[in-house]
């Protein structure tokens, strides 16, 4: 049995951890695995499914970037009789009903494993609100990324809920600065947010694999604001504990 994996990167921190687990599972099950790194570039995401189907994979697991890519991915798998599942992603029944219906009607689309991103976002922003932070700067990674949009929805919901319950103690969430997935991008985004608003008291580097968080922390340190700005994130590198000591 041969399984294809369409992933943003099999070599960055999060991707390499995923690869390690998939390789261990494949070894235990005596399955061959083929990886294609697509960088969450839409054309490469859809091409990766075609490439893996052409390589003779009987099944493909994919971490796509946006729901729209799944139209092509599902069609390719239907045409080639290849099973398809998503990881870290799910098609939104609310926002992408046509694609959701296409998936549920397909005999080859078998489902998704994913986090509850809006809940993740709401809980994360609540940590800041409970600490007394009221002026929160937001750092996204890629515009339109499904996971990012889910987390952002949660941050906004958390702030709206707080403001409804605390009319005399309002919080605000900035429009996002986008960092990509690099440390440098995180650093520049944090600097832009701090210079745009000197009263900023919190930052959320929403994700992107952990490197943007490192960059944001470095920018806050350089600005001498480690006592003034709290930072929370969902994605972090394995050595973050040592980095913060």
Predicted regions: what is each one?
Residues 1-245:
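A residue-level marker of the well-folded mature domains of exported/periplasmic proteins
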